[in-house]
Amino acid sequence: MTKLSTTKICVKSPAKINLHLEIIGKREDGYHELAMIMQNIDLFDYIEFENNQIGDIELKSNNKDLSLKDDNLIIKAANYVKDISKKKDLGANIFLKKNIPIGAGLAGGSSNAAATIIGLNKLWDLDLDNETMLSLSSKLGSDVPFFINGGCQFCFGRGEILENYNSKFDYGVILLKNPNISISTADTYKKYSKEYCSNFLTESEKTNDIRNDLRINGFNDLNSSNQIIKVKNDLQIIVEKENDSVKKALYLLSNLQNCLSFSMSGSGPTCFALFKDINKANEVFEQNHKMFNNNGFEAWVCKLINSGITFL
């Protein structure tokens, strides 16, 4: 039996928003070529990992709507880590306290998968390096590699080509989501391809030009004239056109006092507005939370963070 130095650990698994999501082409492997800026926010799931002596992976959660079977990314990630360890007697009892809404465009499942790789690496004393964890994460989904290091990053390719963005953003964020709505990411990308494929680039040189432009200009901060900062999400035009709830959320956010910018995150349906700092976001939230609820939205207030998955 493998002797381990740690018996139980807990990690914070953060959500993300997209400050920039640009679809620039279609890859030979069927995925889309993307240019993105992804940013962690301080809305967290909490995952507890405890060693067991029977070599099984068991998952429980406070969320009754969540599948706890082999299709759950936490289970998949745990099995990948166990396989690479080559130690059949390793096992874990995992408890997920779910706070990030499911199917919301906030990548909660992807974050949980990365947190499982990082958490079990420590729990099982595997000493996997960052490159190995990134390689494992890329097998689980396009957004998962981002969460291995987290913070704010440029994400290229299908999301697996990562470059750190040395941002110092401290914006406050208000999130809105209709709890009765979820959106298929795959279907949204298919619809975008069908409607806008004529805009896709085919030359790698032009793809590199877009990447370099994003690296140089990035997510533009407020300038001296206090103009509204720029966010971009190519999928928004598809989802907003087909989903009245998303359209309403964007309208409500756009009319909030002191809103610097607003957008949809990922493939939706969660939408967000940015504010000068967390204090301003809290102030606006307190003034409007009843209005959000009356319009059928769940709402959260949070802030951008420069860290990713962390241990408690």
Curated annotation (Swiss-Prot):
User: Catalytic residues per the record?
Assistant: 16, 143
Pathway in which the depicted protein is active: Isoprenoid biosynthesis; isopentenyl diphosphate biosynthesis via DXP pathway; isopentenyl diphosphate from 1-deoxy-D-xylulose 5-phosphate: step 3/6
Query: Which EC number applies?
Result: 2.7.1.148
Top-level EC class: transferase
One Gene Ontology BP term is: isopentenyl diphosphate biosynthetic process, methylerythritol 4-phosphate pathway
Reactions catalysed, semicolon-separated, are: 4-CDP-2-C-methyl-D-erythritol + ATP = 4-CDP-2-C-methyl-D-erythritol 2-phosphate + ADP + H(+)
What is a GO molecular function of this protein? 4-(cytidine 5'-diphospho)-2-C-methyl-D-erythritol kinase activity
Per the record, the domain of life is Bacteria
Tell me yes or no: is Disulfide bond among this UniProt entry's keywords: no
Q: Which Pfam families match?
A: GHMP_kinases_C (PF08544), GHMP_kinases_N (PF00288)
Entry keyword set: ATP-binding, Isoprene biosynthesis, Kinase, Nucleotide-binding, Transferase
What HAMAP family does the record tag this protein with?
IspE
By its UniProt entry, which NCBIfam families does this protein fall under?
ispE
Query: What is the similarity comment for this entry?
Result: Belongs to the GHMP kinase family. IspE subfamily.
Function description: Catalyzes the phosphorylation of the position 2 hydroxy group of 4-diphosphocytidyl-2C-methyl-D-erythritol.
- What is this protein identified as? 4-diphosphocytidyl-2-C-methyl-D-erythritol kinase
This chain is encoded by the gene named: ispE
